Amino acid sequence: MMTLKEALSLASDDIKKLRDDLTLKIKESKIGAYVEQLTSTDISQSGVGIPIAIKDNINVKNWEITCSSNILKGYISPYNATVIEKLEKAGLSPFGRTNMDEFAMGSSTESSCYGKTLNPIDNEKVPGGSSGGSAAAVAGGIAIAALGTDTGGSIRQPAAYCGCVGMKPTYGRVSRYGITAYSSSLDQCGPITQNVEDAAILYDIISGYDPMDSTSANINYEAVTPKLNSDKKLTIAVIDNFVSQASPAIQKGFQKAVNALEEGGHKIIHKNMLDTQKIVSTYYIVATAEASANLARFDGVRFGNRKGESGLKDMYVQTKSQGFGHEVQKRIMLGSFVLSSGYYDAYYIKAQKVRHLIKDEYSKIFSEADLILSPVAPTTAPKFGSFKTSLEMYLSDIYTISVNLAGLPAISLPVDKDEDGMPIGLQFIANAYEEQTLFDGALSLEKAINYKK
């Protein structure tokens, strides 16, 4: 499959041929339900730029945007998200929609109203979530690259499960304008690509200050791609209590990466973080509280397909009960509970205090280290139906959610395979706004490992 870097050097006739070839691949693909979303888009109207697949919660003008939810089916976006404007300005163009967990709430892309997405490496395994369609599209060879969103690992975990590279920028580095909010203080948009250099290129294209987003960081920005340096020697921290909780396959892949980094001249130091159970509790209190507020607008009046005809209350009840899936309803209820009178101080305020402790923990580590190396998930991609309870699914994010709570940048890349041939992904975490160091370290590990798909 052609890389993004290679595609950027193509002439217009070659780009047209590439788009035709990818369109054919989409129509013939059996990877999963995200194909329905991709082919439902009128690709001929997408322009002539290099094709990039787009997650179904990012607004593209005149395209349907549903967030993979019944409540938004048929809604046509009247405008482009800032990241889409930046893509088009750089000569790239939206190529098609990719499937996702409903409103980005999930870790397996099973909660979509379009049905589940299959992992292209093993169709019995989940592709991860919530950006599972984007990762599957890249891994399956029907997209050069894709955009996803990451609220608690939703770019990095699918990339790890599918053997791709997935990058979450520093909070505020990429505009959220035009991206449907799940948790406003945690959401970030980022690239899913075939390799680290492509991720750096796409990151450079979509990042930068945007006055349309009040959370956008108004600071100087320098492109990372021209300065990529895989030879830079770094101090890399290993979080021992994270690694010890991972499966034997993940631990084996982790040690392989550590050995490669040490052989490359990088210094490895050992650290510990807060208990992962506390991190999970904090994340789901903060995320669901913000989700309950953000999704209140989908009421059948402002947004959402209206249901119920016997009065205002009936309309609200029927619209939301028929429009939202089970997982979304559950998270809205949990968020409403922790924000309610009598529980706000007991849960939400305490969660915000723990969030600051998490930031402090990272700050202490980065006073001694340039990067942190961590697993992305406790296991490789599980089979469909493996998560018997919501808690089991939530715990699959134990290594990624603290990064969002602290607003830090991170990148996932494949380093090995388990005995079933499934990818093992690890993540580098950097201090805020240190994306250059993040990409340098990731490129160094990628070259040292030389992962074969």
Curated annotation (Swiss-Prot):
<protein>
    <recommendedName>
        <fullName>Glutamyl-tRNA(Gln) amidotransferase subunit A</fullName>
        <ecNumber>6.3.5.7</ecNumber>
    </recommendedName>
</protein>
<dbReference type="GO" id="GO:0050567">
    <property type="term" value="F:glutaminyl-tRNA synthase (glutamine-hydrolyzing) activity"/>
</dbReference>
<dbReference type="InterPro" id="IPR036928">
    <property type="entry name" value="AS_sf"/>
</dbReference>
<feature type="active site" description="Charge relay system">
    <location>
        <position position="55"/>
    </location>
</feature>
<dbReference type="GO" id="GO:0006412">
    <property type="term" value="P:translation"/>
</dbReference>
<keyword id="KW-0547">Nucleotide-binding</keyword>
<feature type="active site" description="Acyl-ester intermediate">
    <location>
        <position position="154"/>
    </location>
</feature>
<dbReference type="Pfam" id="PF01425">
    <property type="entry name" value="Amidase"/>
</dbReference>
<dbReference type="GO" id="GO:0030956">
    <property type="term" value="C:glutamyl-tRNA(Gln) amidotransferase complex"/>
</dbReference>
<dbReference type="InterPro" id="IPR000120">
    <property type="entry name" value="Amidase"/>
</dbReference>
<keyword id="KW-0648">Protein biosynthesis</keyword>
<keyword id="KW-0436">Ligase</keyword>
<dbReference type="InterPro" id="IPR023631">
    <property type="entry name" value="Amidase_dom"/>
</dbReference>
<dbReference type="GO" id="GO:0005524">
    <property type="term" value="F:ATP binding"/>
</dbReference>
<keyword id="KW-0067">ATP-binding</keyword>
<comment type="function">
    <text>Allows the formation of correctly charged Gln-tRNA(Gln) through the transamidation of misacylated Glu-tRNA(Gln) in organisms which lack glutaminyl-tRNA synthetase. The reaction takes place in the presence of glutamine and ATP through an activated gamma-phospho-Glu-tRNA(Gln).</text>
</comment>
<feature type="active site" description="Charge relay system">
    <location>
        <position position="130"/>
    </location>
</feature>
<dbReference type="InterPro" id="IPR004412">
    <property type="entry name" value="GatA"/>
</dbReference>
<comment type="similarity">
    <text>Belongs to the amidase family. GatA subfamily.</text>
</comment>
<dbReference type="InterPro" id="IPR020556">
    <property type="entry name" value="Amidase_CS"/>
</dbReference>
<comment type="subunit">
    <text>Heterotrimer of A, B and C subunits.</text>
</comment>
